[in-house]
From Swiss-Prot:
Lineage: Bacteria, Bacillati, Actinomycetota, Actinomycetes, Mycobacteriales
NCBIfam families documented for this protein: PRK05416.1
Database matches in InterPro entries: P-loop_NTPase, RapZ-like, RapZ-like_N, RapZ_C
Keywords assigned: ATP-binding, GTP-binding, Nucleotide-binding
Name of the molecule in the record: Nucleotide-binding protein jk1004
UniProt similarity note: Belongs to the RapZ-like family.
Gene source species: Corynebacterium jeikeium (strain K411)
Length: 291
């Protein structure tokens, strides 16, 4: 990728599944100081960007929300991305997603029909939209699954990505999780800490979690734990230059154990400390710690 088309940290294109939280995302970004243009058809995006970043415009950070209600949405948006790249801008594409069950529950709660439902069922509309958006999801820089996220959770995630003072480096989002709850969907790397002994089976350690010293000390002292961390840190450092060259500035790493309470939590805490000590921009979260 040439220098003229590096990722533009001041420009976000927000799209994704209807009901996945586009409006909540727009509101959160406004609170973070972004100028948000909502429900903009793809054919108007390039012009909006040109006007917003003209010399006499006061706008410094622009987020544009667009959805499938426009005709040939995926094709038009792909064309827009090409035109923006040609013009020297590479926006961060944020794709919001959720499970079918979560989307159906949200539509039922507000008693709304899906924009692509037509005369069919709500599921028909969701299926149609997923098919239409497949290519856009594949091109997204960030895929954010909102299934189990409250509005407050969503805002915290957006803060991690878009409220940082330094947007010139790759930001690593590290999270722990429990495999019994399913792996996260919005990740770039997935690692398994279940090869380590489980503190759950020690009656003295069972009341504690991976953020507590007794469990953390136990996990990190196990054979293989330090080598595991060394390999992860080395892997991340080895791929950062490539991600930066490709204009990918947000990378999600997930480390799992059985329940997401002990081993993965301790490993993620230590990994975050090591990366931060190395000067890497890193965020930390524990998805299943309170389950």
């Amino acid at each position: 990728m040439s220098a003229s088309t590096q990722q533009e940290p001041s420009l976000i294109l927000i799209t994704g599944m209807s009901g996945a939280g586009r409006r909540a995302t727009a509101a959160a970004l406004e609170e973070l100081g972004w100028y948000v243009a909502d429900n903009l058809p793809p054919e108007l995006i390039v012009r909006m960007v040109e006007l917003s970043f003209s010399d006499d415009s006061p706008i410094e950070k622009l987020a544009i929300v667009t959805d499938v209600r426009s005709r040939d949405f995926a094709g038009n948006l792909t064309s827009v991305l090409h035109d923006l790249h040609t013009g020297g801008r590479r926006p961060t594409v944020l794709y919001l997603d959720a499970t079918d069950e979560a989307l159906i529950a949200r539509f039922d709660a507000v008693r709304r029909t899906h924009p692509l439902q037509q005369k069919g069922t709500l599921q028909d509309g969701i299926d149609r939209e997923r098919e239409m958006l497949t290519s856009i999801r594949e091109r997204a820089d960030i895929v954010l699954d909102t299934t189990n996220r409250s509005i407050h959770d969503l805002r915290r995630e957006l803060e991690k990505f878009f409220a940082a003072a330094d947007h010139s480096s790759v930001r690593i989002n590290v999270q722990s999780f429990g495999f019994k709850h399913g792996p996260p969907k919005d990740i770039d790397m997935l690692l398994d800490a279940r090869f380590l002994p489980n503190p759950y089976w020690d009656p003295e350690l069972r009341p504690f979690k991976g953020i507590d010293a007794p469990v953390s000390d136990f996990v990190l002292s196990q054979p293989g734990a330090q080598a595991f961390l060394d390999h992860i840190v080395g892997l991340i450092h080895s791929v950062l230059p490539g991600y930066r060259k490709e204009g990918k500035f947000f990378v999600s790493v997930a480390i799992g154990c059985t329940g997401g309470h002990h081993r993965s939590v301790a490993i993620v805490e230590e990994l975050t400390r090591r990366l931060a000590d190395d000067g890497v921009l890193v965020n930390l979260s524990h998805r299943d710690l309170e389950r």
